[in-house]
């Protein structure tokens, strides 16, 4: 437990050191991409626990990200003042709908970001619950194709629906006031604060997942990955556990979708594309599959490089190549904790070999 | 909806359905010899179409198609030799991820060679407005080319597997790899061959439909998922049923356009895939008992 | 007193009647063995009892309640643990962690509680680890606690799997060929271990091929052949039963 606290503290120090470095070198604008990387990292962490630990592949996680992001964007930009009626005024009185000025000095009546966020995450969770049951009964290729299919459905729907802006997506999404004085917003004056807010969310998520991994639930998930029938025989309700971790994982993606959408001030269909889902999976793979820290560091580095445009027009190709190389040559991942465990295990076995 | 319009939808459905059937057959060939679902199957179709379009500028059409098919076949062989052949006991998860990676790689290479533009081969006979009247239905001659060539391919393939030594060796590998190896069949070569066959057939499919459906660097993924839907619908590994299931999906999709906006066309077929996977993963024609015995 | 009662259980696979109308009782506190030549339906019977397969017909009453039709994990929760013919240890987990999974039923922290690491989950985790170490002590594997389970010797892996089932604190323990693949010394050791488990007040039902093991430790033996029960008696009587001798020796299956 103390080791975990140290790891978290160490990571927080790294986050602070990066901010300091950008400040000292006069590259403060890099914080924008680093903030975005943080939100993508939330998706990656959620996928890591699902695919790496519980062994359930998903090639549709961008779908959950998009459900969260799009719904929050839609609710906070759709002008309800034209609708009138008692329901609208009632919601306005409860503070769920709030008035705010638009770009041209007019007045908009839109859903306040908090209820919008809650609704959006709730919707993603509901979808995950609904499809998770039948989807997670599938294994191997079938599971991969079904999750891929889910991702494609979400992508096609957002791309084909005028209400959510079709190919243009939704823009002019307002800032998200989390607490008085703290808002998720892309304004350059709030850049440093948002950097810390975003990584704060990641650290919080990391603490939750690390606790989970080390608990009885974490062991149950790993046992489902290792030998599902034996896990059943130990009294673990495997179907329910798979569904629950799928929902947790979808919730991480949806929260990330909501927050990044408010940070960017908009969302487009490319956020729900298959390529995004594959990208998350590639990061989990290179991070070492069942390795939260590996996934987190790889997500930080690769997303940052990608968002800064270092991969140029080879952006997607880079992730494709990474995926292939990892799977061909190091399918247990590059940053493997198991490697250390193996060395330690070997030493212990040698020591224990003297026993009769 | 009057009868003529109805038939018109059916014809459109058959055209698209044929290509889905061809992609599904590609899935089946590789699945049968290896137990792998090749997620890059749609990319073979795209590659065939794109290569033929480029070659058609300098070569006569039949030669361009032939060379495109050969090129794609070689790509299929290379993929197997470079990425699949030397893996020992790869897990299903690993194979899925590798073929997904390959699919992305092929697509990105295509993007850098050909750009984002949408291309098409010229119509084999006549132009896009030429049509033959059959009863009350106007049919583009290209539709006849698509259906005709596909039927010939399926027939040749059937004959190949049934009557030639090589085909029988491939079937032996599919039935029992170890036993086939004991009989002196090189299972590894059979796997390479299955990748070549499935790449070649996919490429040919890509060539013949490109005048109607067009082709661009990213047309592989939707084709792959629909081809997979069809392969599942027909029962994985069952090529004859795939052809029929392809028609079924094509026609369903074609009619869906009359009910829902065309932008949601893909949603329909993917939704069908999900429903089938949830309800009857052994396919419409397969037995549930057999599906459970397959290694997943 | 009967703890587990199997009544008229049948299961068919295609054209093969794998288990045909089998009935017998497992008395509380005893070691009952099911023997029979290869393909007699022993493992299928195990799968039927533990819920991994559904029978076509029949009834299984465990501790006075019908358990047929329940999911395997529900049956486990009622106090039945099992091992597998081919060891099914969890890879990438240590020996101790494998055992700890067996404590799942005796802890209750849910997803949210575990994520938040609430005080009660902390206490629970300590208790789980203590119980796990006690099991390792019992198995004599304390020294290997932190080794990766699947890297142990085969005999030790079988012990870990047994320990994992034991960690469930079952009322009845189903062992599917516990001596399969073990050498003579390991088999004898396994026999002693099973006897010691019975002393912990655990009823044992085992399927076994190794006659020496079965004859040494069982109180009651059920003989299956082609899915049917052909004999049920104490070991000394089974050894003299002409029908049993015929199927074991006459057909050369043993």
What are these regions (language model features)?
Chain A
Residues 1-356:
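Transmembrane alpha-helices and adjacent helix-loop boundaries
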């Amino acid at each position: 437990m103390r080791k975990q606290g140290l790891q978290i503290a160490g990571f927080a120090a790294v986050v602070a050191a990066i901010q300091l470095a950008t400040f000292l070198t006069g590259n403060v604008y890099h914080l924008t991409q680093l903030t975005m990387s943080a939100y993508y990292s939330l998706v990656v962490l959620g996928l890591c626990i699902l695919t790496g630990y519980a062994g359930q592949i998903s090639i549709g996680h961008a779908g959950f990200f998009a459900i969260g992001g799009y719904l929050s964007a839609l609710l906070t930009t759709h002008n309800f003042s034209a609708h009138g009626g008692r329901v609208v005024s009632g919601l306005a009185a409860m503070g769920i709908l709030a008035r705010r000025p638009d770009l041209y000095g007019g007045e908009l009546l839109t859903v306040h970001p908090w209820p919008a966020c809650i609704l959006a995450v709730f919707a993603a969770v509901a979808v995950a619950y609904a499809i998770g049951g039948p989807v997670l009964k599938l294994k191997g290729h079938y599971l991969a194709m079904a999750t891929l299919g889910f991702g494609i459905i979400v992508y096609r729907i957002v791309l084909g629906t005028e209400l959510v802006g079709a190919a243009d997506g939704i823009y002019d999404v307002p800032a998200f006031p989390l607490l008085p004085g703290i808002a998720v917003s892309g304004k350059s004056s709030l850049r440093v604060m948002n950097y810390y807010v975003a990584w704060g969310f990641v650290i919080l998520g990391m603490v939750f997942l690390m606790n989970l991994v080390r608990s009885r639930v974490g062991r149950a998930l790993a046992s489902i990955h290792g030998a599902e029938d034996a896990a059943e025989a130990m009294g673990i309700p495997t179907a329910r556990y798979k569904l629950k971790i799928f929902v947790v994982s979808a919730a991480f993606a949806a929260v990330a979708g909501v927050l990044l959408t408010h940070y960017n001030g908009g969302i487009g269909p490319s956020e729900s594309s298959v390529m995004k889902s594959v990208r998350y999976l590639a990061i989990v793979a290179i991070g070492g599959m069942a390795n939260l820290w590996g996934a987190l560091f790889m997500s930080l580095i690769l997303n940052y490089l990608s968002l800064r445009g270092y991969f140029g027009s080879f952006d997607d190709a880079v992730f494709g190549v990474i995926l292939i190389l990892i799977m061909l040559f190091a399918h247990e991942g590059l940053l493997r904790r198991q490697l250390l465990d193996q060395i330690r295990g070997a030493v212990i076995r040698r020591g224990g070999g003297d026993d009769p | 909806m009057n009868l003529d319009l109805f038939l018109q939808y059916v014809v459109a459905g058959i055209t698209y359905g044929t290509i889905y059937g061809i992609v599904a057959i590609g899935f089946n060939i590789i699945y049968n010899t290896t137990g792998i679902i090749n997620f890059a199957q749609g990319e073979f179709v795209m590659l065939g179409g794109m290569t033929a379009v480029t070659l058609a500028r300098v070569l006569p059409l039949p030669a361009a198609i032939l060379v495109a098919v050969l090129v794609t076949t070689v790509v299929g062989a290379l993929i197997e030799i470079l990425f699949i052949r030397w893996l020992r006991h790869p897990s299903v998860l690993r194979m899925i991820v590798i073929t997904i990676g390959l699919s992305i790689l092929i697509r990105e290479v295509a993007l850098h060679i050909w750009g984002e533009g949408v291309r098409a081969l010229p119509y084999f006979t006549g132009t896009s407005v030429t049509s033959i009247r059959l009863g009350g239905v106007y049919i583009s001659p290209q539709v006849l080319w698509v259906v005709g060539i596909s039927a010939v391919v399926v027939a040749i393939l059937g004959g190949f597997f049934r009557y030639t030594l090589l085909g029988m060796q491939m079937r032996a590998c599919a039935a029992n790899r170890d036993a086939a190896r004991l009989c002196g069949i090189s299972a590894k070569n059979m796997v390479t061959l299955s990748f070549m066959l499935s790449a070649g057939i996919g490429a040919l499919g890509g060539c013949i439909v490109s005048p109607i459906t067009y082709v661009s660097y990213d047309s592989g993924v939707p084709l792959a998922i629909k081809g997979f839907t069809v392969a599942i619908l027909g029962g994985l590994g069952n090529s004859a049923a795939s052809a029929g299931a392809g028609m079924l999906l094509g026609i369903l999709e074609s009619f869906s356009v009359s009910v829902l906006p065309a932008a949601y066309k893909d949603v329909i077929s993917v939704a069908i895939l999900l429903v089938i996977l949830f309800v009857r993963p052994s396919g419409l024609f397969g037995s549930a008992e057999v599906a459970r015995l397959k290694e997943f | 007193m009967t703890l587990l009662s199997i009544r008229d259980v049948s299961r068919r696979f295609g054209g093969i009647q794998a288990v045909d109308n089998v009935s017998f009782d497992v008395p509380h506190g005893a070691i009952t063995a099911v023997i029979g030549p290869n393909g007699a339906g022993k493992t299928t019977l195990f799968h039927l009892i533990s819920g991994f397969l559904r029978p076509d017909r029949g009834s299984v009453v465990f501790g006075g309640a019908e358990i047929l039709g329940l999911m395997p994990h529900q049956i486990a929760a009622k106090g039945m643990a099992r091992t597998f013919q081919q060891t099914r240890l969890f890879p990438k987990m240590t020996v101790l962690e494998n055992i700890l999974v067996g404590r799942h039923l005796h802890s209750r922290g849910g997803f949210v509680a575990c994520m938040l690491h609430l005080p009660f989950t902390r206490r629970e985790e300590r208790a789980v680890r203590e119980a796990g170490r006690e099991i390792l002590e019992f198995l004599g594997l304390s020294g290997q606690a932190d080794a990766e389970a699947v890297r142990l010797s085969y005999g030790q892996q079988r012990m870990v799997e047994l320990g994992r089932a034991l960690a469930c604190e079952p009322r009845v323990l189903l062992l599917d060929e516990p001596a399969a693949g073990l050498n003579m010394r390991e088999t004898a050791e396994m026999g002693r271990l099973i006897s010691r488990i019975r002393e912990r007040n655990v009823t044992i039902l085992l399927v076994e091929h190794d006659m020496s093991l079965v004859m040494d430790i069982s109180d009651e033996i059920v003989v299956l052949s082609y899915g049917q029960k052909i004999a049920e008696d104490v070991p000394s009587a089974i050894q003299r039963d002409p029908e049993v001798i015929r199927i074991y020796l006459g057909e050369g299956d043993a």
